[in-house]
């Protein structure tokens, strides 16, 4: 049983749980917290729904045997969380203070909201090349997830951009579907581990194009080609591909909390053991903000469920001692 509600100076109720972020992790955390009668306040952000909002077809999410579009899946998750009483707001979070029994969250309109527990589910963003045509054709031939979209390029010629383990793994995986894969890298040396590089080099379907940078992605409604430039000669050529997979890494959206909680050298939030607990009591993290390995909708949803359960248990344990109900320990929001 959680502590009774109190109100802050601006008459906002102090919540049991605030969820920051949407997508599969955030919405699932909201659903489970709502069903546990925690009345979660969820800040989805103005760009809600996460990376799946740019995914045209999702065929590997359990329960949808005929597939579903990314936006449709997010809408279903969102509506399900609403059905059970989650308070969803399309507002961006400006700053947070996560120390002490009461956590504070400041939104872009300057309003301060407080809660006894916070679930972080801001996700991670794929790094992109920022060249003409790339963002315009995202989800229409340009992708950052071979596992998600590789199937749609069966018997087609595609390109993978990158030189690390992720690029080698994506290229190798895509040979299951594609007729050919051209791996484009700006140098002739690779950051990839030897075993991953050798695996790609020994695959007859993979062609290496080194010392080339991407100039633009061609196409009006779908990808029709990839323009590249030779870094030695400056000559430009166009690769006749219908798919472009960008594999130059991901950036966890942890900037909001990076100075407050423990993160790894790349900015992924660290959790304790098999839980979703972070280095701060009452603060939990889920989804791609934590997961640098799988980055799938179903795994993100699972960790969102775990975060809500962890938060519920933590609140129940601390309500008995009154630790989760102190209004004197609020540390002002850091701007």
From Swiss-Prot:
PROSITE patterns: PYRIDINE_REDOX_2 (PS00573). The modification N-acetylthreonine is found at residue 2. Phosphorylated on Tyr-32 by PtkA. GO terms for biological process: cell redox homeostasis; removal of superoxide radicals; response to hypoxia. GO terms for cellular component: cytosol. The modification Phosphotyrosine is found at residue 32. Its cofactor is FAD. Disruption phenotype: Essential, a deletion mutant cannot be isolated. TrxB depletion inhibits mycobacterial growth and causes lytic death of the cells. Depletion affects growth-essential processes, including sulfur and DNA metabolism. Partially depleted cells are highly susceptible to thiol-specific oxidizing stress, but not to peroxide and reactive nitrogen species. Depleted cells are highly susceptible to the cell wall biosynthesis inhibitors vancomycin and moenomycin. In vivo, depletion of TrxB results in clearance of M.tuberculosis during both the acute and chronic phases of infection. Homodimer. Belongs to the class-II pyridine nucleotide-disulfide oxidoreductase family. The active site is a redox-active disulfide bond. Essential thiol-reducing enzyme that protects the cell from thiol-specific oxidizing stress. Plays a minor role in defense against oxidative and nitrosative stress. Is essential to establish and maintain infection in mice. This is Thioredoxin reductase. It comes from Mycobacterium tuberculosis (strain ATCC 25618 / H37Rv). The lineage of its organism: Bacteria, Bacillati, Actinomycetota, Actinomycetes, Mycobacteriales.
């Amino acid at each position: 049983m959680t502590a009774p509600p109190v109100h802050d100076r601006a008459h906002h109720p102090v919540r049991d749980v605030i969820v920051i972020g949407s997508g599969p992790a955030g919405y699932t955390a909201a659903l489970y917290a709502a069903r546990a009668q925690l009345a979660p306040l969820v800040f989805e952000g103005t760009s809600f729904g996460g990376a799946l909002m740019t995914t045209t077809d999702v065929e590997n999410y359990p329960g949808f045997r005929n597939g579903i579009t990314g936006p449709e899946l997010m809408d279903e998750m969102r509506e399900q969380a609403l059905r059970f009483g989650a308070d969803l707001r399309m507002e961006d979070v400006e700053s947070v203070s996560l120390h002490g029994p009461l956590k504070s969250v400041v939104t872009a309109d300057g309003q301060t909201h407080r809660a006894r527990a916070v679930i972080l589910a801001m996700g991670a963003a794929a790094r992109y090349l920022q060249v003409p045509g790339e963002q315009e054709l995202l989800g229409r031939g340009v992708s950052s997830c071979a596992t998600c979209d590789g199937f749609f390029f069966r018997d087609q010629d595609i390109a993978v951009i990158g030189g690390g383990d992720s690029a080698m793994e994506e290229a190798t995986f895509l040979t299951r579907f594609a007729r050919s894969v051209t791996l484009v890298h700006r140098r002739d040396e690779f950051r990839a581990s030897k075993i991953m590089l050798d695996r790609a080099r020994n695959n007859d379907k993979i062609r290496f194009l080194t010392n080339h940078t991407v100039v633009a992605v061609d196409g009006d409604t779908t990808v029709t080609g990839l323009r590249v430039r030779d870094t030695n000669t400056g000559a430009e050529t166009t690769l006749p591909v219908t798919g472009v997979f960008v594999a130059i890494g991901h950036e966890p959206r942890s900037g909001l909390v990076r100075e407050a909680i423990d993160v790894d050298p790349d900015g992924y939030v660290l959790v304790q053991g098999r839980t979703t607990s972070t280095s701060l009591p009452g603060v939990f993290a889920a989804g791609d903000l934590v997961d640098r390995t799988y980055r799938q909708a179903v795994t993100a949803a699972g960790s969102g469920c775990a975060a809500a359960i962890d938060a519920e248990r933590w609140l129940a344990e601390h309500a008995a001692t009154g630790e989760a109900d102190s209004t004197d320990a609020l540390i002002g929001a850091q701007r």
